[in-house]
Swiss-Prot record:
Its main location: cytoplasm. Residues 2-77 form the Carrier domain. This is Acyl carrier protein. Belongs to the acyl carrier protein (ACP) family. InterPro entries: ACP, ACP-like_sf, PKS_PP-bd, PP-bd_ACP, Ppantetheine_attach_site. PANTHER family: ACYL CARRIER PROTEIN, CARRIER DOMAIN-CONTAINING PROTEIN. One of its GO terms (cellular component) is membrane. GO terms for biological process: lipid A biosynthetic process. Carrier of the growing fatty acid chain in fatty acid biosynthesis. SMART domains: PKS_PP. The keyword Phosphoprotein applies.
Length: 77
């Protein structure tokens, strides 16, 4: 498992209060992990801070699964 994936998983567990086993690449933030719109905003902010990147709103709307987040962050950091 990549270091970035581990860091992303840890952020998701911390922000959403879910078990690490639930955080799979296929997991949807809303449907599988129970995130609401505020959770998603806070999660994007956590990703931006942790990886020192900027995620524009139009890109954030496309990040729907853990795998989406990993791919986006790996491309930009």
């Amino acid at each position: 498992m990549s270091e970035k994936l581990q860091k992303i998983q840890a952020l998701i567990v911390e922000q959403l209060g879910v078990d690490e086993e639930e955080v799979t690449p296929e997991a949807s933030f809303v449907d599988d992990l129970g995130a609401d719109s505020l959770d998603l905003v806070e999660l994007v902010m956590a990703f931006e801070e942790a990886f020192e990147i900027r995620i524009p709103d139009e890109d954030a709307e496309k990040i729907r699964t853990v795998g989406d987040a990993v791919a986006y962050i790996e491309e930009r950091s």
